[in-house]
Amino acid sequence: MAGNTIGQLFRVTTFGESHGLALGCIVDGVPPGISLTEADLQHDLDRRRPGTSRYTTQRREPDQVKILSGVFEGVTTGTSIGLLIENTDQRSQDYSAIKDVFRPGHADYTYEQKYGLRDYRGGGRSSARETAMRVAAGAIAKKYLAEKFGIEIRGCLTQMGDIPLEIKDWSQVEQNPFFCPDPDKIEALDELMRALKKEGDSIGAKVTVVASGVPAGLGEPVFDRLDADIAHALMSINAVKGVEIGDGFDVVALRGSQNRDEITKDGFQSNHAGGILGGISSGQQIIAHMALKPTSSITVPGRTINRFGEEVEMITKGRHDPCVGIRAVPIAEAMLAIVLMDHLLRQRAQNADVKTDIPRW
């Protein structure tokens, strides 16, 4: 299986399956001399891990990360950092009934068409359980970006179903189970989730991630544009079906006079572009949004076929999220951090000596 690595200078390679013994990753390109402990990674893992809310899957995994290599006496050595998280709460018997059945809306059918077999236990490699290692690797990037460049990366839920959420108060995001920045909408989200659990159904969501303090100049035209790499990283997250940078698809209804971000001596007067122009960061906030589909792991009966081509009725068993968008927030933050870390190292490698007199804000 190819496609398990992201990045060029800051490279993250993950391995493991949902019901395997463990998940792991190798992180290459981490500069030496960075203070790093398992506790530095655990905070974001705790934000992502299952079983922490009545609105997410009740699979209870502690997700305790172990640093296996690349750190000596609490400091990175510049060599490959190996990370491992053991799986402790697998219930593979929940999936025995789908050994020969393809769950509609899942990767069962396509994995078997591609490889001729599949690990049917919780989706195997296609499960969102894999993203735990992305979050661990992303936490390394977030720490480096914050300490060396003052870059802050934050994410939040900005829509669930037909309930739009305004970014009113970032401090509220960690104070509720929805990563919601709009305290006036938490009750409505709660009611929607209770209704979905009662119906055995699910709902889609929109997640927004913002990076502040990113310097101008990151991005490698033409094929490794910063926005292209961000879109690639976010689209690689399970259930993501669309990505927008800045105003995204809303620009369709705008005129050029409205959409352009005018510049004065005081700086940019707007940020419709989401902090990226010509594939290169402008120094403004980088803003990206991603749309996540409603999970197909629901108890509402649906039609499908088995591997023998026979039509059968499917009712999903097991422990699942009514809205996968909730736990996607720390994953989106991690993927944005990984991309920015990679591009900062690439910029430093090629253009460290470049100096300009152009104003920066």
Swiss-Prot record:
Pathway: Metabolic intermediate biosynthesis; chorismate biosynthesis; chorismate from D-erythrose 4-phosphate and phosphoenolpyruvate: step 7/7. InterPro entries: Chorismate_synth (IPR000453), Chorismate_synth_AroC_sf (IPR035904), Chorismate_synthase_CS (IPR020541). Pfam families: Chorismate_synt (PF01264). It comes from Escherichia fergusonii (strain ATCC 35469 / DSM 13698 / CCUG 18766 / IAM 14443 / JCM 21226 / LMG 7866 / NBRC 102419 / NCTC 12128 / CDC 0568-73). Keywords: Amino-acid biosynthesis, Aromatic amino acid biosynthesis, FAD, Flavoprotein, FMN, Lyase, NADP. This is Chorismate synthase. GO terms for biological process: amino acid biosynthetic process; aromatic amino acid family biosynthetic process; chorismate biosynthetic process. It comes from the Bacteria. It catalyses: 5-O-(1-carboxyvinyl)-3-phosphoshikimate = chorismate + phosphate. Its EC number is 4.2.3.5.
